Amino acid sequence: MENRYSVHPEQAKRFTTAELREHFLIESLFVENKLNMFYSHEDRVVIGGAVPVKESIALDAGDFLKTDYFLERREIGIVNVGKPGAVKVGDEEYVLEHKDFLYIGLGNKDVFFSSLNEGGAKFYFISATAHQKYPVQKASLSELPYDHLGEEASSNVRNLYKVIHADGIQSCQLMMGITFLEPNNTWNTMPAHVHDRRMEVYLYLDLAEDAKVFHFMGEPTETRHLVVGNEQAVISPAWSVHSGSGTSNYCFIWAMAGENYTFKDMDAVPMNVIR
């Protein structure tokens, strides 16, 4: 597991491009036959990828978390971003199709990731600290309601799925969902916002090899950008905007953790303020 320490905004605005990428971008999340994890000190979230090819992979942090097992004091949200796969929780196995979600609450000791049939499952997950146990729940993308948002004139027509949140799958503090931009639409989260009470992570998906998203971050009056490719994630501290525009349409998985569990708790940034 790799540490990603917190960064003060006064420090971040002086970073070079390389330093911004080193602290906030996760470039290589998915590695075959490996559990790859990043420990962000922004609200203590663990960002990870598991790509089981030859055999199943256990959810195990070794000695890093100083607990007897990964979910002893944590909860986790999982999305399969590859071909069909399964997550085994204790004696129960949950089959996840492409972009299906699974929530696993505190106290579940044995968790394993595996591929089905021809292989190719690819699991993305976010874990946050937890104080109460909630039941394991699966959400199939094909069965989920969504909010249709945006306008063609603003190039931001999109479908937003809220999955783990106060009115959906229950958790202690983790919130998670996915947003799909429609063809010929490229902007997400603009006008921008911040939420000083929780951090957020974006995982960008469905981008061609030569397509990129220009992800904007930083304080509203000190924005910077990261050039992001397919299956790369961005850590957004509570003080940072998180918005982007792509060279094509795409989708992104968003996940939040922190003090407030209200999805609409955000502070809008007027367009005449952002710099």
Curated annotation (Swiss-Prot):
Signal peptide: none
One Gene Ontology MF term: 4-deoxy-L-threo-5-hexosulose-uronate ketol-isomerase activity
Co-factor remark: Binds 1 zinc ion per subunit.
Cofactor(s) needed: Zn(2+)
E.C. number(s) listed in UniProt: 5.3.1.17
GO biological process: D-galacturonate catabolic process; D-glucuronate catabolic process; pectin catabolic process
Keywords noted in UniProt: Isomerase, Metal-binding, Zinc
Pfam families, per database record: KduI (PF04962)
Record carries keyword Metal-binding: yes
Residues where Zn(2+) binds: 193, 195, 200, 242
Catalytic activity: 5-dehydro-4-deoxy-D-glucuronate = 3-deoxy-D-glycero-2,5-hexodiulosonate
Similarity remark: Belongs to the KduI family.
PANTHER family for the chain: 4-DEOXY-L-THREO-5-HEXOSULOSE-URONATE KETOL-ISOMERASE (PTHR38461:SF1)
Name of the protein: 4-deoxy-L-threo-5-hexosulose-uronate ketol-isomerase
UniProt source species: Bacillus licheniformis (strain ATCC 14580 / DSM 13 / JCM 2505 / CCUG 7422 / NBRC 12200 / NCIMB 9375 / NCTC 10341 / NRRL NRS-1264 / Gibson 46)
